[in-house]
């Protein structure tokens, strides 16, 4: 099975060396708007195995990190780092949720049943499995974007002022608050309201430091 996966995904692996970059220094993080209307508890998403719709209200009281992920991206190295982040901050109420998406460089080409084997045998490989919830593959931008991402993007300005025009992106219409690439992140507070948003190039170590600083106000660390 591992050999078959390696052959089938040769082209996506070649594309994985491409990570969207910008010619100038970008902000890594932006705080979300203070007048956000609504919460994530109004939404739900389909689990990766397609067997259940998971309502986000089940995460009430938790600090939730939403991440759009891809298996064959140069940033897929963040997967093990996200596992470590989940392990380190779970005791403080952090929950990570991953949303596979194929809109950036076509770097999540498989169907839902192929995503976990791709992670386990190809990239990162070596038996890797995420320790956080993954949801069914879907769009995060454009006409068919998942409703939860419409809400998250509306709630938080993007750290980058550069509008997406890359030939490696696949959606319309393009909007200023759109996610720019794989592994962007949104943190939602225990009341279900978005708190901050990170650029895809922000190191997970930076994300962790920002979350720890945020958690200080709750006196949980």
Swiss-Prot record:
At the top level, the lineage of the source is Eukaryota
Keyword Nucleotidyltransferase annotated: no
Write the Enzyme Commission number(s) for this entry. 1.11.1.9
Instruction: Give the signal peptide, or none.
Output: 1-21
State the active site. 73
Q: Which InterPro entries match?
A: Glutathione_peroxidase, GPX_AS, GPX_CS, Thioredoxin-like_sf
Q: In which tissues is it expressed?
A: Epididymis.
Instruction: List the PROSITE patterns hit by this protein, alphabetically.
Output: GLUTATHIONE_PEROXID_1, GLUTATHIONE_PEROXID_2, GLUTATHIONE_PEROXID_3
**Presence of the UniProt keyword Oxidoreductase in the record:** yes
The similarity comment for this entry is:
Belongs to the glutathione peroxidase family.
| UniProt protein name | Epididymal secretory glutathione peroxidase
Organism field = Rattus norvegicus
């Amino acid at each position: 099975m591992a050999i078959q996966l390696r052959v089938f995904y040769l082209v996506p692996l070649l594309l994985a060396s491409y990570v969207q970059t910008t010619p100038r220094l970008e902000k890594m993080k932006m705080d979300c708007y203070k007048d956000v209307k609504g919460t994530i508890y109004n939404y739900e998403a389909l689990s990766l195995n397609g067997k259940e719709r998971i309502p986000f209200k089940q995460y009430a009281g938790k600090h939730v990190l939403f991440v759009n992920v891809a298996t064959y991206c140069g940033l897929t190295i963040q997967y093990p780092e996200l596992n470590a982040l989940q392990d380190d901050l779970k005791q403080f109420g952090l929950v990570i949720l991953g949303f596979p998406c194929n809109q950036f460089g076509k770097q999540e080409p498989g169907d839902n049943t192929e995503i976990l084997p791709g992670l386990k045998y190809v990239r990162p490989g070596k038996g890797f499995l995420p320790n956080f919830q993954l949801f069914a593959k879907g769009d995060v931008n454009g006409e068919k974007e998942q409703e939860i991402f419409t809400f998250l993007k509306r709630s938080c300005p993007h750290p980058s002022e550069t509008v997406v025009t890359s030939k490696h992106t696949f959606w319309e219409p393009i909007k200023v608050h759109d996610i720019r690439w794989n592994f962007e992140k949104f943190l939602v507070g225990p009341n279900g309201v978005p708190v901050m948003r990170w650029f895809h190039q922000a190191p997970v170590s930076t994300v962790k430091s920002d979350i720890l600083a945020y958690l200080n106000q709750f006196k949980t660390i």
